[in-house]
Amino acid sequence: MRVQVYWNLHKMCWSVVALEGEDKGRVIDYVNYFAITNATLVVQPAGQARVRLEGKKNVHAFVRGEVESLGWTREQHRGWRRIRYNPYRDACFMQDLMPDEWVDGIPVLPVNWAARVDLEPGAIAWAYKAEWR
């Protein structure tokens, strides 16, 4: 099932929105842990501009893809990267790099797709095989 997931600042958990089926467009669950495969990391520019203009957050960034798991299942693999998004600083999701991977002293790279994204409490997200497409 295709969904999009975002960090809910009011409930302090992940909100899961159905992208297909009879509940399309509706929040179908609130979870602490979630895994998505074939994940697209989306930032809507108009929503981001509004955040910067008004100084208060709105839902405009999310992870979209196929449901993998509602529970904690992340296996430790080489290649997992922490990903994050700051609407006041970044135009897209960014992946943290190890010091030996920095490019011109920059510790992050943009990312908009990953083979899998695991979401944890506290708005923490991990991506496996993350890249810019």
Task: Identify the role of each PLM range.
Residues M1-N8:
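Structural detector for short beta-strands of small beta-barrel domains
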Residues K11, S15-A123:
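Acidic, low-complexity, intrinsically disordered interaction modules
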